[in-house]
């Protein structure tokens, strides 16, 4: 698959285009140009490392939204076996922006739930651009309760710009569905491991992201609103999105500093889409480590630690200034 380059990656794109030209010319050339191709490849890798070593929060948000970035189904297909998708909320409809079902992880039966975006126009519409409606969150809730009933670990993958804000969704209780999920996940009697793989947009992300281990991919984002949305409110212009991204603290490193996530999963240079096998291996290792650690605790201890985590959010200290 041909890589789609972002605006700030254009110097890399130009080098890669030259490499492709040389590869094409090599087939009809009597001169060996493999050394030149190798030199340009090394230069491209060095440039990629340099650019990705100093990304701004706004640029990271663009990487998090990259159209070729691995989605939940990609992780399910690569990390789990015997996946059996479960459909519907048993109340209204089946929401294709949320997928979930039973699977095996290293031979152990687990429940997997995640947001799912689309690749082409048809699939994007089918998946509602990864924006769940109330029935999607209620489907997720049904699967969470099944996981609890059968005492199996729960894995969630977060990648959404936010919950769908349409009139129908609001009429069917979007905020209630999100709030109910938060309430149930806070006391779910199984290990819960949440991984932000792309965009973690507001309550739409949080509705499947309350757990015992919260981890993020290196170039994922997690925030109460998109940078564009924040800029539109504060400055009445989405053009200020880069400034908003800087202020909001949407990156994995910033959130780790604040104690809102537990672990950052390193991505290949250039992002998860540049080397999906390496990304899958890194995520699998992180999931294995988290599951092994959580299974050492009793359910009572898990719930106690989860409660302490939730009650610890938003704490601050007052300091007298003399």
Curated annotation (Swiss-Prot):
Q: Which domain of life is it from?
A: Bacteria
Show where the CoA carboxyltransferase C-terminal domain sits.
Answer: 30-293
Compartments where located: Cytoplasm
- The positions making up the signal sequence are none
Q: EC number(s) for this protein?
A: 2.1.3.15
Question: What enzyme class is recorded for this protein?
Answer: transferase
Reactions performed catalytically: N(6)-carboxybiotinyl-L-lysyl-[protein] + acetyl-CoA = N(6)-biotinyl-L-lysyl-[protein] + malonyl-CoA
Q: Name one GO cellular component term.
A: acetyl-CoA carboxylase complex
The record's Pfam families line, in alphabetical order, gives: ACCA
User: What's this protein's function?
Assistant: Component of the acetyl coenzyme A carboxylase (ACC) complex. First, biotin carboxylase catalyzes the carboxylation of biotin on its carrier protein (BCCP) and then the CO(2) group is transferred by the carboxyltransferase to acetyl-CoA to form malonyl-CoA.
> What is this protein's record name?
Acetyl-coenzyme A carboxylase carboxyl transferase subunit alpha
What organism does the record attribute this protein to?
Nitrosospira multiformis (strain ATCC 25196 / NCIMB 11849 / C 71)
């Amino acid at each position: 698959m041909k890589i789609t380059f972002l605006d700030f990656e254009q110097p890399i794109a130009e080098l890669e285009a030259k490499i492709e030209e040389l590869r094409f010319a090599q087939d009809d050339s009597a001169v060996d140009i493999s050394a030149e191709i190798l030199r340009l490849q090394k230069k491209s890798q060095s440039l990629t490392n340099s650019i990705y070593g100093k990304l701004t929060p706004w640029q990271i948000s663009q990487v998090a939204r990259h159209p070729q970035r691995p989605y939940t189904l990609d992780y399910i297909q690569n990390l789990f076996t015997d996946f059996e998708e479960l459909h519907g909320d048993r109340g209204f409809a089946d929401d294709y922006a949320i997928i979930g079902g039973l699977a095996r992880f290293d031979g152990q039966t687990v429940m997997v739930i995640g947001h799912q975006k689309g690749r082409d126009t048809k699939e994007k519409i089918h998946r509602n651009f990864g924006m769940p409606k109330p029935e999607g969150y209620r489907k997720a809730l049904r699967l969470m309760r099944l996981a609890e009933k059968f005492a199996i670990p729960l894995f969630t993958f977060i990648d959404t710009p936010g919950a769908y804000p349409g009139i129908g969704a609001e009429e069917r209780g979007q905020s209630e569905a999100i709030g109910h999920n938060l309430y149930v996940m806070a006391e779910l009697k199984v290990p819960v491991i949440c991984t932000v793989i792309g965009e973690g947009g507001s309550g739409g992300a949080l509705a499947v992201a309350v757990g015992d281990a919260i981890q993020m991919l290196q170039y994922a984002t997690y925030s109460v609103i998109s940078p564009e949305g924040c800029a539109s409110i504060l400055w009445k212009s989405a053009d200020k999105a880069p400034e908003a991204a800087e202020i909001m603290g949407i990156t994995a490193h910033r959130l780790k500093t604040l104690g809102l996530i537990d672990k950052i999963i390193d991505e290949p240079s250039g992002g998860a889409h540049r080397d999906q096998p390496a990304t899958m291996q890194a995520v699998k290792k992180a999931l294995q480590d988290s599951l092994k650690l959580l299974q050492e605790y009793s359910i009572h201890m898990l719930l106690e630690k989860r409660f302490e985590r939730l009650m610890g959010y938003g704490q601050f200290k007052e300091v007298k200034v003399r």
